[in-house]
Structures are given as structure tokens and as C-alpha cells.
């Protein structure tokens, strides 16, 4: 199954972009959760503005859907500068990056999503740009080729990635600020759901907000998607009023259980328990057993299951925990 087809997928979906922009916080004061990140960024931004300097280059990493792009835009708004957005796979040629860099104004932000997917050639262009605000460009070809240096205005590179370990050391070491985004707790997600409901003029009870939040896998993007689907259900079944009971009914219809699991999560956990006696089981064997790519298991399914204590990664393989048996209604003695 394609990850983006899941209602609880943390991957962005194109049709959600317009609504997401409308409900996205613009300033740190509106940014809910991630208290350590918020406090640090407030200090770093104020210090840069006091010194009339560009903010240090910033790397933001963490699971998808936690607000890396949102934070990059907030930084630009707080600094009062423009932000130019691109992504690693889009920057295929050094000239593409050079064009973006030379069009930056002083202190502007260049935001590169999926920065771990930059090609080595693009990284080579970035190194002097990040360190010295200089751009090395080759003019001509063959024996007549020569290198010229262009001065760039002071700027901030903000890179976002779900796979910080895939960044090369030379690139990672050039970021002066590194921030990791963690899964959100239910209280913070409830606040996010309430804020989104207010932006969308929804009639949402506090209990209804909590019901959506607790099934959102610690991820704001999922919370906002579930809220929109619950709104649809409430519009048809309850005159647009979202109560706790209406939210529960809608989420049951969507096959999202109280833990935020869908059938793919249950399929994975059941495979470990029923086919491999609870583990340990190697990733390749597990992928074959459930018919999914190992990357999908490693990057999409496992992080939340591990964070919630349903799965353990060990040197010998994946192991189901006692919480898994309890959730599946299976006795450990069976």
C-alpha cells in the first residue's frame, strides 16, 4: 500500500496545502509544543537581530508531519526576511542552486526540504556559500574552463530532513544550529486541534478535540487531517457539531483505533506476534511477511510504534512488547 493513501500518513498531500497554509502558525507565540526548540529559537533569533546578523544556518530534523516547514517559515517571519523554498530532489544542477543563492537579499532564508537527498555536486556548491558567503562558478569547458568567485549576501540556510543520519558529515558540520522535533504529547495536540478548529470556524467541543488528538500519533499533520474528516462526518450526521461521541464514530468509520493505529500497524504487530512468536525478527523477513518495503517499515511504521513502547529494535531484530500483546488481546502464554 502507498503510504500517502493512509488517513494517518504523516506525509504531505497536495490537496491539503491550501488549508494547511491557512491554519499554520506564523510566529513563535502561536507555535504549540516543542518547548525546548521554541525557547532556543527565540534566543537565537533575538540575538541575531540585535547584532544585525544573519541567523546561523539551521538544520531541523525529525519524523514527517511535526512542523519542520512550519518552523522554517516562522523563523523567516520572526527575522522579518524573505524565505525561498526548494527541496533536495529538485536541485539537480549546480546552476539551479546558484540561481537561487544569487537572488537572495541580505539575511534571507533559503529553505531546502529533504536536504539529505542533495547530490554531491550540489553539496560542493553549498560548502563555500555556507562558510564564506561565496559562490564558486566554473566558466567555460575543457582546458579553457576557469573558476570565478561571486560574493553572496549574508543568508541563512535552513535544511529539513527526516533522516539526519543520511547527511554527509561535511554538510552536517556546517550547521550552527541543529534542532530535533519530537512527537507531540496529547495535551499539545489538543491545543493544536482547538486552534485549527478556530481557524476553520468549526463547532468543536473540548472532548471532541481530545478524541481527535489522542488518535493523531503525536503528529500535527495527522491531527489536522483527522479533524477535517471528522468535520465532514459531523456536517452530515450532527449539523456540524463535533462532540466526543461524533469524533469517536467518525474515527471508527475511518478505521483509526484509540491508539492511532490503522490496519498497517496492526498487520505489522500481528505478524511479529503470530508468525515470529513475538520476535526477534529481522527487517527483511518482516517486510516479506507483510508485503511492504523495508524502508516503509523503518521510516514510516516503526518510529511511532517504538516511541509508544509497542516495538523494540534490538541487534537481533524486532521484538513485540507486552503492550503489543495487550493491545491485540493476546495472552503472552498463548
Swiss-Prot record:
Its main location: cytoplasm. GO terms for biological process: DNA recombination; DNA repair. Residues 185-255 are annotated as: Small ATPAse domain (RuvB-S). Residues 4-184 are annotated as: Large ATPase domain (RuvB-L). GO terms for cellular component: cytoplasm; Holliday junction resolvase complex. This is Holliday junction branch migration complex subunit RuvB. The gene is ruvB. InterPro entries: AAA+_ATPase, AAA_lid_4, DNA_helicase_Holl-junc_RuvB, P-loop_NTPase, RuvB-like_N, RuvB_C, WH-like_DNA-bd_sf, WH_DNA-bd_sf. One of its GO terms (molecular function) is four-way junction DNA binding. It is an enzyme of class 3 (hydrolase). The RuvA-RuvB-RuvC complex processes Holliday junction (HJ) DNA during genetic recombination and DNA repair, while the RuvA-RuvB complex plays an important role in the rescue of blocked DNA replication forks via replication fork reversal (RFR). RuvA specifically binds to HJ cruciform DNA, conferring on it an open structure. The RuvB hexamer acts as an ATP-dependent pump, pulling dsDNA into and through the RuvAB complex. RuvB forms 2 homohexamers on either side of HJ DNA bound by 1 or 2 RuvA tetramers; 4 subunits per hexamer contact DNA at a time. Keywords: ATP-binding, Cytoplasm, DNA damage, DNA recombination, DNA repair, DNA-binding, Hydrolase, Nucleotide-binding. SUPFAM superfamilies: P-loop containing nucleoside triphosphate hydrolases (SSF52540), Winged helix' DNA-binding domain (SSF46785). The lineage of its organism: Bacteria, Pseudomonadati, Pseudomonadota, Gammaproteobacteria, Pasteurellales. It comes from Haemophilus ducreyi (strain 35000HP / ATCC 700724).
